[in-house]
Each structure stands twice: as C-alpha cells, then as structure tokens.
Design a protein with these regions (language model features):
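AMP-forming adenylation/ATP pyrophosphatase catalytic core
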Residues: 1-178
Length: 178
C-alpha cells in the first residue's frame, strides 16, 4: 500500500482484506482503487462505477413498493407505549412514524451521507456500512430510506437514532424487504 503512495490505515487494510477473499474493487484513497481479480491484487486510478441508476421511490402510504429487484412492504401500526422484547431483526425495520420529517424516499446512497444508528454515540458513513454489509455486486441495490432531514435506515445496519421507537411513540412504521 505504501509503495503505491497511500497511507496505511485500519479501514484501507480491512477493505483490501475483504477483497482478497472475494472479487471486486474498493476506493482506498482519492480515486485510487484496490482491485482483486483472479487472485491478483492491484491498484488502479479512476472512477468506481458503484452508484446504480435505480430510480428513487417515494413512499406515500402503506403498501408494497418496488426498488430494483427488491420489494419493500410498509405498514403503519398504532403503538401503546409499552416496549416489549422484540427480535433485533424485526426491531431494525421499525421506525417512529411521527419522528419522520416529510416523505420517506427509497434510493441509493449518495457520497458523504452519514447516519447515527440506534444506541450509538457517533455518526457512521453510509458508504462504509453498505460496503461492510454487502458484496460489491449487491451494494447498488442496498435499500436506503431517507426523509427530508437525511438517512433514517440502512439495510444491513439498522435505523437512525432520531427515529427510534421509545415510550413517546404513538405510531410505528414497520417494513419488510424481500
């Protein structure tokens, strides 16, 4: 890595380590990509064509919405304020409906987006969350839910702290991704 003029960091080594186990490429610094193909690791400069042309989908009501090859079903439920023991997989697909600002939109990630996940005291880069949860060829179809204030959910990682369900919640937006 140093031979290519790049600084060695935990993140870049982790990205390259993942590549060696798979096939693909990762941006390690400012337009320089680590590329792994047929068991050979190399470095290249250029643009990574990771962003998909999947169109944005506005969620206007309950129902099933198509996003690329995925179906997302949205339902709104009343909530009595009692927090029960809920399986983590289901809880990550539930948001406090009244804390959502404006319309929900399903779309691809955009450069520089951040999210503060539930029970975390720091912001996470959406790109890094998607890279960690999805193989290179599946990243462009990762479901990202946004409202007028930013990202509220990242598939494979969870919901934003600002829309988490708490004792003040009146309505829940629940969704499943198929």
């Amino acid at each position: 890595i140093e031979k290519e003029g790049l600084t060695v960091s935990h993140d870049s080594i982790e990205d390259i380590d993942r590549l060696i186990l798979d096939v693909g490429k990762a941006n390690v610094k400012g337009g320089v990509f680590a590329v792994c193909s047929k068991g050979v690791l190399s470095f290249a400069k250029g643009e990574m064509l990771e962003n998909s042309t999947l169109r944005s989908v506005k969620v206007s009501d309950e129902g099933v919405y198509q996003f690329g090859n995925k179906e997302i079903e949205f339902k709104i439920y009343p909530f009595d304020g009692k927090i029960a023991n809920v399986h983590k997989k289901f809880a990550n697909c539930c948001l406090d409906y009244d804390k959502i600002k404006g319309e929900i939109v399903v779309e691809n990630r955009r450069e520089g987006e951040k999210i503060r996940l539930v029970n975390r005291d720091f912001d996470s880069d959406v790109r890094k969350l998607v890279n960690k949860s999805f193989r290179l060829e599946d990243r462009s179809s990762a479901v990202i839910l946004k409202d007028s204030q930013g990202v509220v959910f990242v598939e494979g990682s969870g919901a934003a702290e600002r829309v988490k369900i708490d004792s003040e919640t009146v309505k829940i937006l629940a969704f499943t991704i198929k």
